[in-house]
């Protein structure tokens, strides 16, 4: 996987329309990526329920993508989970847009709830040319 620089990721996310998507400023997305994956597109983490989280935003195979090994997977983003590990974050961003529109907003991301929610997330884009 590719490890993004902070400002590099901010620029890519902005280009893909995440800034203020569903009311969440760009800093929220960069902060979430930092604490979910440390900006690494190749990150994978297995969960106790047998599902796996994939990519820079740690998108889960029980609901959002298909990895062929998660029983009862819904694959609501209609993608193979491997697509979420690409150095090109388009698939992750498109799926994240679907997730954040699902009703719970960015609360869907535990790391965002724990580390970003209610903080000054603008620090994550400070000094970036955007």
From Swiss-Prot:
Its main location: secreted. The active site is at residues 36, 53. The keyword Secreted applies. InterPro entries: Glyco_hydro_22, Glyco_hydro_22_CS, Glyco_hydro_22_lys, Lysozyme-like_dom_sf. Its EC number is 3.2.1.17. It catalyses: Hydrolysis of (1->4)-beta-linkages between N-acetylmuramic acid and N-acetyl-D-glucosamine residues in a peptidoglycan and between N-acetyl-D-glucosamine residues in chitodextrins. GO terms for cellular component: extracellular region. The keyword Disulfide bond applies. Residues 2-130 form the C-type lysozyme domain. One of its GO terms (molecular function) is lysozyme activity. It is found in: Secreted. It holds the Pfam family Lys. SMART domains: LYZ1. Disulfide bonds join 7-128, 31-116, 65-81, 77-95. GO terms for biological process: defense response to Gram-negative bacterium; defense response to Gram-positive bacterium; killing of cells of another organism. It is an enzyme of class 3 (hydrolase). Lysozyme C is capable of both hydrolysis and transglycosylation; it also shows a slight esterase activity. It acts rapidly on both peptide-substituted and unsubstituted peptidoglycan, and slowly on chitin oligosaccharides. Monomer. Belongs to the glycosyl hydrolase 22 family. Lysozymes have primarily a bacteriolytic function; those in tissues and body fluids are associated with the monocyte-macrophage system and enhance the activity of immunoagents. This is Lysozyme C. The lineage of its organism: Eukaryota, Metazoa, Chordata, Craniata, Vertebrata.
